[in-house]
Amino acid sequence: MFDVVISDIEAREILDSRGYPTLCVKVITNTGTFGEACVPSGASTGIKEALELRDKDPKRYQGKGVLQAISNVEKVLVPALQGFSVFDQITADAIMIDADGTPNKEKLGANAILGVSLALAKAAANTLQRPLYRYLGGSFSHVLPCPMMNLINGGMHATNGLQFQEFMIRPISAPSLKEAVRMGAEVFNALKKILQNRQLATGVGDEGGFAPNLASNAEALDLLLTAIETAGFTPREDISLALDCAASSFYNTQDKTYDGKSYADQVGILAELCEHYPIDSIEDGLAEEDFEGWKLLSETLGDRVQLVGDDLFVTNSALIAEGIAQGLANAVLIKPNQIGTLTETAEAIRLATIQGYATILSHRSGETEDTTIADLAVAFNTGQIKTGSLSRSERIAKYNRLMAIEEEMGPEALFQDSNPFSKA
């Protein structure tokens, strides 16, 4: 094949699932093939995440427009990348990082850079007429991830007063991805009927989970257990529970407390919940700045529960290495838009995996119809994925893509949960 190079890059403003603008980027090659990617956006963000560039023009979208990011693609990244091989992802990402020249991509915007980075990989895959997961992962990528399904939303993803942000189920006894989705959908619909019978709200939050007004985190967990059993499954054996506390959102940085409680109290609360409920994964149980709290949590629960760092690590290899050295957490949430390029995302996964940390590919609360993360989870054999509830099309699109990949692979597909603390 003759050289296939980048001939043009187009960027446009679209809307995400919250009705706010984001970027859709198309990389076009000299052969006419192209790849297109849409960039997600988070509500609960880590302070060390790469910068999502917004226009801050109050006359457009309450200041959340992305016209400047689009301009940076067209005026900076297009001339920097035109003529480069569509297959040289590492070089292209390095060029964009250098063009930005800041530690957190604040000059050009991580949203601009990531859109180009992901679209480039898709253009290369399409040029070779290969699915993205196969192009990136090669013939050894055949693991379908166990999903973490967010059935009850709280925290910054809803307005219902629940302290924790996500109450999830994990279909750990499923023999396949398709069956895992079925199990999740049946529990989701059972939960809806339970809420209706109790005259609780069945409106959904940002990630498609229900957002009823509940008195406590324990009440949300009790509802999940009831829904699991109503759907005909056994808690712990068939389906386990997972939490995303998003503890930074209720952490007071001045007096270093969690709604007035010490980090030891917070660890105690989580330990007690794990005693009473079949919880095998807790994300961001402590605030990203609370290293002492994270250390205590890791010492207390790290030998029996998956402790996931999201805000703690923000998909940044340097922060992951630092956390590993301090013995913090035992798993890493992977969000490409936290770091801004596909190359850096892959490096974060590689580093965590080498050190024995589990990895979970994740969506953001502000999503689009783009299904790239489904392919990335398979390409990098993460074994776990977070992509929301069993409602809202931007969430369902990822599940449908995973099921399509599984069917395409046939007997080669392996559904495998990478959480070492799974009870199944």
UniProtKB/Swiss-Prot annotation:
Binding residues annotated for (2R)-2-phosphoglycerate, in chain numbering: Q165, K335, R364, S365, K386
Cofactor binding remark: Binds a second Mg(2+) ion via substrate during catalysis.
List of catalytic residues: E207 (proton donor), K335 (proton acceptor)
Pathway: Carbohydrate degradation; glycolysis; pyruvate from D-glyceraldehyde 3-phosphate: step 4/5
Reaction it catalyzes: (2R)-2-phosphoglycerate = phosphoenolpyruvate + H2O
Enzyme class: lyase
GO BP, sorted A to Z: glycolytic process
Domain of life according to the entry: Bacteria
GO cellular component: cell surface; extracellular region; phosphopyruvate hydratase complex
Alphabetized UniProt keyword annotations: Cytoplasm, Glycolysis, Lyase, Magnesium, Metal-binding, Secreted
Pfam family membership, one: Enolase_C
Keyword Metal-binding: yes
One example GO MF annotation: phosphopyruvate hydratase activity
Cofactor: Mg(2+)
Subcellular location: Cytoplasm; Secreted; Cell surface
Residue stretches spanning the membrane: none
Amino-acid positions noted as binding Mg(2+) in the UniProt annotation, renumbered to this chain: D244, E283, D310
EC number: 4.2.1.11
Function: Catalyzes the reversible conversion of 2-phosphoglycerate (2-PG) into phosphoenolpyruvate (PEP). It is essential for the degradation of carbohydrates via glycolysis.
NCBIfam families the record matches: eno (TIGR01060)
Family to which this protein belongs: Belongs to the enolase family.
Protein name: Enolase
Native source species: Chlamydia trachomatis serovar L2b (strain UCH-1/proctitis)
